[in-house]
Amino acid sequence: MKCSWREGNKIQLLENGEQYYPAVFKAIGEAQERIILETFIWFEDDVGKQLHAALLSAAQRGVKAEVLLDGYGSPDLSDEFVNELTAAGVVFRYYDPRPRLFGMRTNVFRRMHRKIVVVDARIAFIGGLNYSAEHMSSYGPEAKQDYAVRLEGPIVEDILQFELENLPGQSAARRWWRRHHKAEENRQPGEAQVLLVWRDNEEHRDDIERHYLKMLTQARREVIIANAYFFPGYRFLHALRKAARRGVRIKLIIQGEPDMPIVRVGARLLYNYLVKGGVQVFEYRRRPLHGKVALMDDHWATVGSSNLDPLSLSLNLEANVIIHDRNFNQTLRDNLNGIIAADCQQVDESMLPKRTWWNLTKSVLAFHFLRHFPALVGWLPAHTPRLAQVDPPAQPTMETQDRVETENTGMKS
């Protein structure tokens, strides 16, 4: 499948769980025919239970609902929680689950990291939010800062078709068959141009990174990137510095209070290279940053699931949308400039690690290890990802004598 730019779409930026979850649950609540939901994490907390209730209600009124969870990101849902959905008719699958080794999850590489919802070929959502209370401000200081978009219009056809053709584990023949079953056309008023881009381990290994690099090459005035896990490759870093040196204002927002300490260590290895190359680096300090968004000049923007690190750019299954729309670009710009002003600390030369031989050696070793990490993983034996579908719970059956008595008396004693 190869997607093209689609015109005439409506786009709404959704910030954090306070905006995202009500929009998703409302769309599911209004679904009439079909729901497809993919996510990396689904926790059995307050947010997860609300999603459970919304899907259960949809299935009970006859809506076809399909769920794909990552086997690493969502390993701990209870049997009761899942069985209630499958008993109602929800198709529930895990992407490449693996047994634990000494209580530890071992399937950390090549994960299904996408976050997509499609409802009735009419509405779609794509972004960085999982289904957990961690994305709500009520979670406290560790609540995550994140973004997604709600989409209406022809782009929804492409997202639905992508879902039908790219369910992990489908054979090539089945994907070919799917191409002859196109999504229904859905025309909605709107002006935004949108392109769906994704990363897989087959034909689209570097599509998302290529669009970022193209954007940096074409930028003329300003680029703002906010990304939770920032550790891209040489080409990306060189493109950032090259854009800055030709006069483009580059603002990079990264985690100042990361959920994993190694994230901050990795990003700080790049500070000397970026800051001295003219890139403005901002550490977001209010809470952990989980967003994956960017904008360029006054019309280009992207929102999705892809981080700018080795896992997302080289191993995981990811999905973003590229957006050409001045209004959306301005909305995202206002939001990002707002958090820069209120919640970020700019990295200046006084904050850069001292250039001692020891620090330089550590930086070089760590940088090359992290950057070549995907290639090292590539030496591991490859396998076809396995989809594990959860069967509905078996219905209890009455023993023969009980059945006879019930038929004779109309009741079971």
Regions flagged by a language model, labelled:
Residues M1-S413:
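Charged, low-complexity intrinsically disordered terminal segments
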